[in-house]
């Protein structure tokens, strides 16, 4: 399963913290595991794909470093996937809200600038 995050999502502080916390040695350790069928790829745009093991037993280190990014420790892979999807959805909603606010501010500034020139 391959999940691609847009570059605007990668610029958010939570996504940057995720990139920082997934250090190279953790990624290499997960590549060496023999359970490649139980893993997913997270591919950030303009970044190399990172392999994260979905198995809860072997992902204790990743789970503790993500600070609640994944669901609580369960044996269900669907809960982890749903948690990841909901986190991405909430990040995209935050980014959309920020863009709407910036658009409104720019519109107000342009209108006040053009109205001020008429006088």
UniProtKB/Swiss-Prot annotation:
Keyword Membrane included in the entry's annotation: yes
Location of the region described as Required for DVL/RTFL small polypeptide activity in the Swiss-Prot/TrEMBL record: 83-114
GO biological process, one term: negative regulation of cell population proliferation
Topological relation to the membrane, as annotated: Single-pass membrane protein
Chief localisation class: membrane
Gene Ontology CC terms, in alphabetical order: plasma membrane
Domain of life: Eukaryota
TM helices/strands, residue ranges: 96-113
Keywords on record: Cell membrane, Developmental protein, Membrane, Transmembrane, Transmembrane helix
Compartments where located: Cell membrane
Role: Small polypeptide acting as a regulatory molecule which coordinates cellular responses required for differentiation, growth and development, probably by restricting polar cell proliferation in lateral organs and coordinating socket cell recruitment and differentiation at trichome sites.
Family label: Belongs to the DVL/RTFL small polypeptides family.
Protein name: Small polypeptide DEVIL 24
Organism: Arabidopsis thaliana (Mouse-ear cress)
Lineage, highest ranks first: Eukaryota, Viridiplantae, Streptophyta, Embryophyta, Tracheophyta
């Amino acid at each position: 399963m391959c999940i691609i995050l847009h570059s605007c999502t990668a610029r958010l502080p939570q996504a940057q913290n995720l990139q920082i916390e997934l250090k190279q040695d953790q990624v290499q350790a997960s590549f060496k595991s023999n359970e490649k069928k139980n893993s997913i790829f997270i591919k950030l745009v303009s970044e190399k794909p990172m392999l994260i093991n979905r198995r809860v037993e072997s992902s204790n280190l990743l789970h503790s470093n993500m600070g609640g990014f994944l669901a609580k420790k369960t044996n269900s892979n669907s809960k982890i996937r749903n948690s990841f999807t909901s986190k991405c959805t909430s990040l995209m909603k935050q980014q959309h809200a920020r863009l709407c606010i910036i658009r409104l501010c720019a519109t107000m500034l342009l209108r006040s600038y053009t109205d001020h020139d008429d006088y």
